[in-house]
Amino acid sequence: MAIDLRPFIPFGRGALSQATDPFRAAVEFTLMPMLITNPHLPDNPIVFANPAFLKLTGYEADEVMGRNCRFLQGHGTDPAHVCAIKSAIAAEKPIDIDIINYKKSGEAFWNRLHISPVHNANGRLQHFVSSQLDVTLELSRLVELEKERKTLSIETARSKDQLDYIVEVANIGFWTREFYSGKMTCSAECRRIYGFTPDEPVHFDTILDLVVLEDRMTVVQKAHQAVTGEPYSIEYRIVTRLGETRWLETRAKALTGENPLVLGIVQDVTERKKAEANKALVSREIAHRFKNSMAMVQSIANQTLRNTYDPEQANRLFSERLRALSQAHDMLLKENWAGATIQQICATALAPFNSTFANRIHMSGPHLLVSDRVTVALSLAFYELATNAVKYGALSNEKGVINITWAIMEDKGEKKFHMRWAESRGPEVMQPARRGFGQRLLHSVLAEELKAKCDVEFAASGLLIDVLAPITPEVFPGMGHNVPEQRIA
């Protein structure tokens, strides 16, 4: 914020007088950073700093008032610039100068400084007014342009080997092309990128022969457009003589004249292209998984509301099922969405029941990894079946048990996955009038995802569910041939 000059201190005490109030208002509200100093006070201190100056430097008003402007200087400030400013102030002369100053944060910036004396009607010096402008980007660009100019001068004055070394360090190839003849000179890195030998002559047609057919016409069009003198940039693919496909990026500009000469650089961007492709793949995969998750949430909501008429109970069931879904997703995240083993699925889905029924829930089977969609469906199904077992089945008394087993078996000359949920020693079960959520998951989602046959039997000994599914890479990714076959008793 700017220093509040109200009520105005008399001029003799160092501030602006009421007579200069319109000037003060103009300075305060301009977007240009401005300072006013009083040369009649010791060390020519700041008596006004507008908000734009405080924003530029990062200082608060009370941190700059009463100080000489030299607090903006630092180790990088050129003493010659400081001397020039002192001389102008001593001579009561205006000065324009670019000087390195420092913000409160310690960040250096190029300050385009203008200082001008302000005299009263009698010609007596009254104040100094200064404006600041951060021209760091402008001067940096000028420095970059100067470096480019020097680089081209070095190319002419020094040996070709030195230039080749510079561009090789940056992994950028440099080339020139005579527009009409097509003859080219190439740096060592340029030759490496295209797969040329160090001594072989290079012609534009030599490069064009390497460009894949789909990109060749675009490369030709861009090359012909160079004669206009406009710079161009293009990405295209080549196939080297060793059969390696590479993505290249070329930037070029022609020096126009009677015999135009095209100057260009080339860079191998194959790895960047692969990263972009992987990023796009991940984005599509995330969208796909989000869509699947939303479909599962919608299914859970529909099934819960369809079969539960008490709103409070429906809310509780929906929350429990979403929690089970969340646990399945957490498990998949740990495995980088590569799926999970059936052992992991059982352990995670049945974790809420293990503290009470740990010795009554048994699981066994080989190490089998299933896909992410099957992981979610199995997790929800196991959770629902266990919940129903607590209410009506084997876990509703003191001695009932649940056995979950899975195996790879031979069925009609074909390997198949067999999983069984078997409840025993519980109360006698009766077939319900309608299927519960867990059974619907087994019949619909699992049957669809695993292409499985699902048999449910309400036996006198307890609920018995058998799932039989073919072995496919989509459902069982990376399953080797070393998984032993066995039959579930």
Swiss-Prot record:
Q: Which residues carry this modification: Phosphohistidine?
A: 288
Where is the PAC domain positioned along the sequence?
93-147, 232-281
Any GO MF annotation of the entry: protein histidine kinase activity
Keyword list (alphabetical) reads: ATP-binding, Chromophore, Flavoprotein, FMN, Kinase, Nucleotide-binding, Phosphoprotein, Photoreceptor protein, Receptor, Repeat, Sensory transduction, Transferase, Virulence
Q: Which reaction does it catalyse?
A: ATP + protein L-histidine = ADP + protein N-phospho-L-histidine
PAS domain sequence ranges: 19-93
Family matches, as InterPro entries: PAC (IPR001610), PAS (IPR000014), PAS-assoc_C (IPR000700), PAS-like_dom_sf (IPR035965), PAS_fold_3 (IPR013655), Sig_transdc_His_kinase_HWE (IPR011102)
Which EC number(s) does the record attach to this protein? 2.7.13.3
Classify the source by domain of life: Bacteria
PTM S-4a-FMN cysteine: list the residues: 69
Free-text description of this protein's post-translational modifications in UniProt: FMN binds covalently to cysteine after exposure to blue light and this bond is spontaneously broken in the dark.
The segment annotated HWE histidine kinase domain runs over 259-341
Q: What does this protein do?
A: Photosensitive kinase that is involved in increased bacterial virulence upon exposure to light. Once ejected from an infected animal host, sunlight acts as an environmental signal that increases the virulence of the bacterium, preparing it for infection of the next host. This photoreceptor protein is directly related to the bacterium's survival and replication within host macrophages.
Q: What NCBIfam families does UniProt report for this protein, alphabetically? A: sensory_box
What is this protein's record name? Blue-light-activated histidine kinase
- Which organism is this protein's natural source? Brucella ovis (strain ATCC 25840 / 63/290 / NCTC 10512)
